[in-house]
Amino acid sequence: MGILTLNVEEKIKIISKNTAEIVTIDELRKKLEENQKLKGYIGFEPSGLFHIGWLIWAQKLKDLVDVGVDMSILVATWHAWINDKLGGNLDKIKLAGQYAIEVLNAYGVDMSKVRIVYAEDLVKDSNYWALVIRIAKNTSLARMKRALTIMGRKAEEAELDTSKLIYPAMQVADILYQDLDIALGGTDQRKAHMLARDVSDKLGKKKVIAIHTPLLIGLQGGQRMEGVEEDDYLASVKMSKSKPETAIFVHDPPEVVEAKLRSAYCPKGVVIDNPVLQINKYIIFAKDNATLKVERDIKYGGDIEFKSYEELEKIYSEGKLHPLDLKLATARKLNEILDPIRKKLESKTEFTLLVEELEKGVTR
């Protein structure tokens, strides 16, 4: 179905699929009804290896492009430098950015319809830094510290060096400077997006619509504790490249993907915080007309094919599907998705070398 044949509700259905929240859906509907050409962005720190959790926002980026949003990708090199990623080596950070763009291209994002913006393009403009200062002037120190969770850091880590405090103001400036309608990110970016919405009123800037995608839980699963905020809990158990044992990377060979899924947390009949089911919901069934074929011996019920995630979850929650059967089927399907990405990366020596180097010592 082409962009011109989609009505407003069809666009909203595509945009909202597999999102944690849209702030606000009414603002999005209003802009779509006015037939405005919307501008959006996703920013990421090029900080290492690309794991499958990032495919969730990559799919949403693809969805937004497919419904006609003018999307840009901000390769946040300076932000990664401030955040001490890759030892603060800007050359490595830039190469990691190029590697991530290659992954997105191989995944199926139409890069001819996406603008690539590097942090260097923004920071060379004095107007950008003037905006950073204006944002800082309109934000309390306490709120700026609370926003450090967007970096994967705690508020007290602001004491490490003063640049950490500048980071949230820079991320808000990234949004306001580009005059965006939509900011896309994981739920861990919520505090920056909410700050951007609040500050925009004070500065007379356009109020951005925030689209947040879920964070994929790590393969270890999660242990929920009373009194812990949902955002803090999810940030602590999410799949992370700094905890490689919890993650599946897009370059992992098929046998490694299968081995990791075999050992993943996946209790029989348990749906909550089940990483194997989440991979199905947010990655496998995020694609149009997706199916999952589970191969079983006839004495265990024979093969079964699921045509929706809802059907899979129902059968699994009823205890009618063995965890190992689910894991092996998920590994086969996930490897089908990862295969073109692996081939693309293997065809370029510089990315093969980068992956090897990063695997030797994973940094923050």
Swiss-Prot record:
**Residue ranges for motif 'KMSKS' region?**
238-242
Pfam families annotated for this entry? tRNA-synt_1b
Q: Write out the catalysed reaction.
A: tRNA(Tyr) + L-tyrosine + ATP = L-tyrosyl-tRNA(Tyr) + AMP + diphosphate + H(+)
Q: What is the protein's major site of localization?
A: cytoplasm
Give the binding site residues for L-tyrosine. Y41, Y167, Q171, D174, Q189
Q: Tell me the GO BP annotations in alphabetical order.
A: tyrosyl-tRNA aminoacylation
Signal sequence interval, chain numbering: none
Q: Name one GO molecular function term.
A: ATP binding
Query: What InterPro entries does the record tag this protein with?
Result: aa-tRNA-synth_Ic, Rossmann-like_a/b/a_fold, Tyr-tRNA-ligase, Tyr-tRNA-ligase_4, Tyr-tRNA-ligase_arc/euk-type, Tyr-tRNA_synthase
The EC number of this protein is 6.1.1.1
Which top-level enzyme class is recorded in the Swiss-Prot or TrEMBL entry?
ligase
Q: Report the GO terms under cellular component.
A: cytoplasm
- What is this protein for, i.e. what is its function? Catalyzes the attachment of tyrosine to tRNA(Tyr) in a two-step reaction: tyrosine is first activated by ATP to form Tyr-AMP and then transferred to the acceptor end of tRNA(Tyr).
Q: How is this protein named in the record?
A: Tyrosine--tRNA ligase
* Originating organism: Sulfurisphaera tokodaii (strain DSM 16993 / JCM 10545 / NBRC 100140 / 7)
